[in-house]
Each structure stands twice: as structure tokens, then as C-alpha cells.
Curated annotation (Swiss-Prot):
Location, primary (coarse class): cytoplasm
Function: Catalyzes the NAD(P)H-dependent reduction of dihydroxyacetonephosphate (DHAP or glycerone phosphate) to glycerol 1-phosphate (G1P). The G1P thus generated is used as the glycerophosphate backbone of phospholipids in the cellular membranes of Archaea.
Highest taxon of source: Archaea
Places the protein is found: Cytoplasm
Gene3D superfamilies: 3.40.50.1970, Dehydroquinate synthase-like - alpha domain
Pfam families assigned: Fe-ADH_2
Pathway as given in its UniProt record: Membrane lipid metabolism; glycerophospholipid metabolism
Designated name of the protein: Glycerol-1-phosphate dehydrogenase [NAD(P)+]
GN (gene name): egsA
Amino acid sequence: MRFKTVDLPYHVYIGENVISKLPKVLRSLDANYFLLLTDEVVKNLVVVNLKETLKDFEYDMMLVESAKMEEARKIVLRGGFADYDAVVGVGGGKVLDVSKVVSSELNASMISVPTTASHDGIASPVASFKENGKPISISTNPPSAVIADLNIIKNCPIRLLRSGYGDLVSNISSVKDWQLARDLVGEDYNEVAASIAVMPAQLMVSKADELDLTLPPHLLMLLRGLIMSGVAIAFVGSSRPASGAEHKFSHALDYLGYGNGTHGEQVALGTIIMEYLHEKYYGRGDWEQIKMSLEKVHAPTTAKEIGLTREQVIEALMLATKLRKKRFTILEAVKPTKEEFELVVEKTGVA
């Protein structure tokens, strides 16, 4: 029998005022001296209120200016001789992604303190950047702890919460793609990781009629789902449970520089399209339910809402069929033509 070591977040706190748990988490990680990474806005809104909480600890604070590998390298160089016990990232995706890379490079524990709930990077072992306008993903160590305080996150723009909903819902089509790869090309499949990723997404979709993402109980559901999505990725050491053809579509939009959508908004549109294909060819998609659930939370369901034309959507879909060919998805299984994509975006109302 073979065994594999899996690194997962050791502490996860989600709720109101859980930022008060930060000293406890730091002590449990023997982090007497740490690096706190944040940005200018969060520093003035959130970090300024942590001074009393952190009065018994020694720490340095640096500001993250951009979501780039070069930014992470600069911080590593500046802090390379400090011998930090931990890196505490307080902020949105930009800060958390840089914090993951810095903590991995410095061989220090990472504590994720999100101020938004816009995607599953809160707890995942993946950092996403744009280099020369192109998206890249970097494998990192997962956070050792996640502290998601509802009193902080509820103040982020509602668009970012809807984006997080879109990213979580995309797991439904991602897992279907993984199952296709298992059935058609014999890819390894992990039922536990798949369930961890897809069950919270299915729960949110089933409750879309009553969801108000600004209410603490519903925001709690969203955060749990996004954190579990990150844990599923860490569990198998791959983004497979949470990234399928819908993410290829989003990456294609990023490569082409089209539109003004967030990551979650782009993958949500991609999910509607890929669910249509799953339903048409394999009878196990439900694009109408996905679209309806996105509409219920007022997330975009059309290209126009995120600054895309029909032609740009089709071009991105065609490019998506050429990206990451080793990741088998519905696109590799059915090889849609441009004409079919045109039919799909019309039938679904995406464009």
C-alpha cells in the first residue's frame, strides 16, 4: 500500500470577529516573528486595527503593490535574511497570491486573512499572476491557517462576492470534466476531492432562490465553499477538482485581453456554456439551473455584462480548445466547431 503526505490548512476559522484568533494561531505555529503583507487600502481599513491584537508579537509589514512574480521576488529579497516564522497575508487575491509565493520561498508558514471572497484562492496551494498580460499559475504550499472574518469580508464590494459565487459554481462543470477524463482516457480520479469541491457548489445552487450574499449566514456558506474548493485542490495537489473547460475559456479571455470581467464572472459564463455541452452530449449537465442561480444572485450571465462581444466570446472559445491540451475536458471529448459554439452561445443566451 502506498501512502502520500497531504498538506492542508491546519487552522480554519470562519465567522464574526474571528480575527481575534490570530494570536492563538500564531502561537500554535511558533510564529514569534513574522512578515505581514497587505496593501495600502487594507492597511488603512483593517491592519490599523490589528495593532493591539498583535502587540505581543514582533513583525515587519510590507505593502504588496502588484500581483506579479516580480513583486514576490522583491519581497523575498527584502526579507530573505530576517528568518521569519510565518507570513501573514491580509487582503484580497493580489496580496494572498504574493503571500503564498513569499512564504513558500522563505520556507515559512502562511496565514491567509482574506478581505474578499472573490475566488477559491483563499485556501488553495496555487498563486495566479499575469506576466506580460498573460495568466500564469504557480504551485505553492497551501496556507497553514485561514482566518475569514465576516465582519471584514462583508464590507467588500458585492460584485466580488458574486464573483466568488461564480468561481464556486464552476466546480460543478470542473468535476464533470474530471469524471469524463476518468471514463474516457483513464485519468486518476479522487472521489473525496471531487466531493469536497462539488458539494458546496451544488448546495449554493440549490438555495439560490433564498440567497443574499450580504447576509452573514449566506456569506458563511460561500466562504466555506471557497475554502473547501481550495482544500480539494491541496488534497490532490492539482487544480483538477476546481478547474476544467470553463477555466480554459477564462484563461483564453485573459490571453486575448478581452472584456472587463473578474475571474469568477468569466468562469461562470464558461460554466453555462460547458454545462450545455455536457447536457447535449452526455445528458448530465444543467445549464439552465446554473444560469438561473447566477441570475438569482445578480451575477453576470451574458457576455455584454462583462464587456464582451459575441465575436470575442467565440474567439475565446476556439482558443480554449487549444489551451492545456493535457487537461482532458468536454472540449477534448466532443471537439466543438466554431459553428457549434455559435449555436451554444445563442441557445444559452450568453451572447
